[in-house]
Amino acid sequence: MAMPSYSSLSSHISITTTHTRPHPIFPCYNDTQSIPRFFISSDTGSSASKQRNIYLRLGSRKIIAGVGEGATSLSSHSDKMKTDSFPDPKLAKRDFPPGFWKDDIIDSIMSSNKVAAADEERVETLISEIKSMFRGMGDGETTPSAYDTAWVAKIPALDGSDHPHFPQTLQWILRNQLKDGSWGEEHHFLTYDRLLATLACIITLTVWRTGKTQVQKGIEFFKKHAAMMEDEADHRQPSGFEFVFPAMINEAKSLCLDLPYELPFIKQIIKKREAKLKRIPTDLLYTVPTIFLYYLEGLQEIVEWHKIIKLQSKDGSFLSSPASTAAVFMSTGNTKCLEFLNFVLMKFGNHAPCHYPIDLLERLWAVDTVQRLGIDRYFKEEIKEALDYIYSHWGERGIGWARENPVADIGVTAMGLRILRLNGYNVSSDVLRTFRDENGEFFSFMGQTERGVIDMLNLNRCSHVAFPGETVMEEAKHCTERYLWNALEDVDALDKWGLKKNIRGEVEYALKYPWLRSLPRLEARSYIENYGPNDAWLGKTMYIMPYINNGKYLELAKLDFNNVQSIHQKELRELRRWWKSSGFAELDFTRDRVAEIFFSIASSMFEPELATCRDVYTKSTICTVVLDDLYDAHGSVEDIKLFNEAVKRWDLFLLDRMPEHIKICFLGLYNLVNEIAEEGRKRQGRDVLGYIRNLWEIQLETFMKEAEWSEAKYVPSFHEYIETASVSIAGATLVLFGVLFTGEVLTDHILSQIDYRSKFAYLMGLTGRLINDTKTYQAERGEGEVASAIQCYMKDHPEFSEEEALKQIYTLMENALSDLKEEFLKAKDVPDKCKRLVFDYARSMQLFYQQGDGFTLAPNMEIKQHVKKILFEPVP
């Protein structure tokens, strides 16, 4: 039987809550500064005689709250409680693992990991320098390519004289031979790359009968290292190597250069080239742009030049390649080719790069870099300008590395699709169909079946921003996951298109923590550790892009991460103090998860200016956990009915009827609500007390409903269960408190887009409830709980086994997550920070419950390491 989607459920499940007394969104209450506020204080004296007195503060006056006959005081000892009519019942406490992040542990870690305060002046300098890099992005910055320069230097003078047309390029070759006799990227060594560049340079010098010393040194280098190619992995071959290298070997032989032509590897690659040349579909070669245009210099004997000219790019190049364009010019004399080469040398002076322009590639990767490093908030204008530029060149078949590039690149296209969609641009996933073959597999370029890890990683990350019904994105997800898992099994899993510091680490993180199961600060920490400021790229030759791989990005990211972490540590210490002063720390039926809760919000809403949002969210979540545990561990339904009644009436005079543990819970909630209301009024410019109370009433009624189910051993229908449980998970309640403090003044219309009336909130609660139940239902069933999504689904569908029902629940959850993504990415009326808070709550639930009950069992699970890395361990 097909699992119903959330939309089919919504016809049965009311998203609005009508069973509580109605409140307008912001009902008119008196000024919140006059609201009575209770707090607990400890008298001095011995521990045996310490009394915690309840005080009512009205303005500057402090009076003892009158309860029954005289003042009520709360003692830490139950035998001193005056609860004659309602004795404290025995609670059915669950056996929770004790909290790990106690004050002594936190202090110990923080003292051993102290770092110097961030140099604010250095931070500002780095921000300014990176902004200048963004503003300076034109057609792309890249390093010289000895290989391409050698091809440009081969062009003879147009006047027929025996000289190169671009003599400065020949001089560059003569002056830039490396000490070992090779040419190429000095700080990175790949045998294929060095031998290719060296062979091109010694051929060009020989053609112009100059640089005999350099030629001889180059030949010696070639002889010494040629056999090493056999041992270097195939995926380290530059693009088109199998065509251009054998072609140059043949040319070197015709020039009588003393090279090891009889090496088995060289003979083998020449044979492979001959076989591949026969398989090139000539009809495809001349009708549509393919990657073959990138290395035409290696296909000269089969190319019909008058036909290939029809595929020339608008800028006169052939796929932005100086070498390929130079080869076409020498065979055709095409003036547009010459114009392109003049354009390149006007930019670089005496050398040519591997390809140029690279404007789209550079902008996308720079944006991706600052976003993944967690420093994008400093560059909002620059990012917007870069993405507007990308979008202006977006095509229905994707984009390549340059605006005039007629051959789309799957890596650039996938990154562009993901980043543009995440930033609110309207882009279709249909562009990915360009890169799919008849077997449903994805390739990097038209005309090439090879794939690289970086390309497939970008495609995988792109697939996670799919909208419902985008089958090509789902296919991309499955294809890339299979490819990337296989790549990880290879000990030498490197990449075809680049030399990255830790591509394995990037892939492992992406597969283990996909976008919906990650959080921004967690990803930033991971990428800071994996990012390589000196990474190189591999096209036809190796090159470096300084606006993508730059130590300034990493330095700023580290300074910023550690600075933000130090702010979060101070906030956590204050929250730990509040946890104790509220009395919650003394309750033995609840879970101490202050650090884990704070981690969940600090990993998302991490900016220093959102301190109040973090504080309110954390305290509200703590209070919710305490109350949830209270209702789960209740001694009698009557007690919690009394608690609910007190909240509805907001009546302090019900305190004398409450057992001690319920008094602590009520006072904690009462003080917190008033605290939030006071601050909320300042931020929103209107009274929010009624709004906040109404949210708590809705929340507690769902707790009450579940307690009644538990008491009666009642298993509701799946629809009835979801109606209550998607609210009791508390996501909407917590988020709706937090959004008041995101820096936005929220209208009733904005709130209606994210509160209980909205699809957004419903999906958030539904996905949170379902992932929670899948990981907790067995343990809770063992403790006597009978209602969970799995058990309720099995009640409706007795033909399903437990395992089958669980699969159905996962299917429903994934469908709801897909719908939630669409709401997040398409919502236009909701401020970004409000959307983030809603969406990242859902992501945090997926993270915490990814492998089990990562909240209750947090001290024994991977969440513990996440908390440590984000909150306590500075980046070295």
UniProtKB/Swiss-Prot annotation:
Q: Which Pfam families match?
A: Terpene_synth, Terpene_synth_C
Manner of cofactor binding, per the entry note: Binds 3 Mg(2+) ions per subunit.
Q: What is its main location?
A: plastid
Annotated Gene Ontology MF terms? Answer: magnesium ion binding; terpene synthase activity
Give a GO cellular-component term: chloroplast
Annotated keywords: Chloroplast, Lyase, Magnesium, Metal-binding, Plant defense, Plastid, Transit peptide
The sequence motif named DDXXD motif is recorded at 628-632
EC numbers listed for it are: 4.2.3.44
Please list the residues that bind Mg(2+) 2. 628, 632
Give binding positions for Mg(2+) 1: 628, 632
FT transit peptide: 1-64
**Domain text from the record?**
The Asp-Asp-Xaa-Xaa-Asp/Glu (DDXXD/E) motif is important for the catalytic activity in the class I active site, presumably through binding to Mg(2+).
State what this protein does.
Involved in defensive oleoresin formation in conifers in response to insect attack or other injury. Involved in diterpene (C20) olefins biosynthesis. Monofunctional enzyme lacking the DXDD motif in the class II active site relevant for the cyclization of geranylgeranyl diphosphate (GGPP). Requires (+)-copalyl diphosphate ((+)-CPP) as substrate, but no activity with GGPP or ent-CPP. Isopimaradiene is the major products of the enzyme followed by sandaracopimaradiene.
Q: What is this protein called?
A: Monofunctional isopimaradiene synthase, chloroplastic
UniProt source species: Pinus contorta
Which gene carries the instructions for this protein? TPS-mISO1
